[in-house]
Amino acid sequence: MKKYFMIVVAAILATFLFMAFSRIKQQESLSGSYVVLGWNDLGMHCANKTFAKMCILPPYNNQFSHVIKVGDANTLPVVQSAGSGFYVTYEIPGNTYSVGKTDFWTYASQLFGTTISPNIGLTGMGMTGTMLDSLNYFYAYGIPITPYTDVNLTTESPFQLAMLKAYDAGNTLLATTQNTIPVSNEINCVSSGCHTSEQDILDEHDQLPAFNNPPVFCATCHADPALGMPGNGTTVSFSQAIHQTHGSLTNNCYKCHPGPNTQCLRGYMKIIGKTCTDCHGSVSNVGNTIESGRIPWVNEPQCSSCHDANHSENPGKLYKLSKGHSGLFCEACHNSTHAEVTSENANDNLQNLTLQGYAGPLKKCEVCHGYIPAGPGPHGYNPVGIIPISGNIPTSSEILPNYPNPFAFMTNIPYMIKDEGPVKLDVFDLSGNKITTLIDARLKAGEYKAELYANKLSAGTYICRLSTNGLNYHRKILVVK
């Protein structure tokens, strides 16, 4: 079995190496000049809870980060690269150990042919450590986290927060952030109601001698690209076997993918009503397309299936491996697959909410640039509050009715500027307390709109005030919850 362990580790590293409070103080630029962005690659990592009979997936989680030196009006931001002397550490506050929360280490030597130290994962990473660096990002593969915190060993907490800390070569703490490190054991074939026991699954393979000597590692025979396991070459991949066998029995993805309690599909696609099958097709379709030549985990649905080229992956790459603005990973600003911000889960939104004051993709230019640059940014996006509507020059300055109104999530606030000059757009409550400033910049004459998110607003009536060239204009807006 030792050769299987070596295959797993080598293949996992080869596959991923070049791929790209307790709420503790979340995102903090301690020196005032650095930002660290963290993310997980998949939106959910699954693992068996018990390994006495078989192993579908071991404890294995990933974290990534960028460290950015904030720019100013005269200097562009700098994404710190490998060899710069900077480094990033990771930890999971409230979850400091895994031994005892799972029996993985009891059976690891039988499954992988070698002894693995307690609380250390397949790649040698522990529950805390220093991330490795590659090009312009930092990474940690194989963190052996379980969904159980130190104070609750029986109830899953699938959306815990990792703490990332960025340091310079002199060991000065520069910035911190917290981002989701998702994990679930809710892939159990028994708890799903499909099988009476794990032994029942092994009995389906009773013609194979190895199944009389558990635990059995499924990927030993069934290829699993997620683990870098090639299989034995004589049977179908694990994904094909599972989806084709069960496709005629259910079209409920949460029978296996976590799960009715975890609800791992939680991102913006979920919010706007998309389901698993909208992108992946039916359970049977997932298996049948593999039989037709698709490689699971490698050939997956593309953003470009619905979005234009300006909002799509890099050619030939998955979303999780694609990069955009200044070489940043797409997930650094938009978050993980299946958990795109704005997410239904508060922890997914925490990093961007802390950085820019509202949930959603990271698009407040000042976070990295230190000021609002002129002209459009990534995806042709203009800074919040400075979104041109048309090239028309208005005959008067005015704040127009917002839409939708009332609103619960986000509203657009159109406004017109007659003459070039300083512009402020503020939001007040009915007591006259300023809630937020949407724009404070010098604008040319034109028609614009601002976006206001309701995540920090209680239900009620608010006043938007547009100030330009010594005059004020007001408009009521209504928030519902």
Descriptions of predicted regions:
Residues 420, 438-474, 478:
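Short, surface-exposed loop/turn motifs with a glycine/proline- and acidic-biased composition
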Residues 65, 157-169, 462-466:
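Short, aromatic- and glycine-rich surface loops/edge beta-strands on solvent-exposed regions
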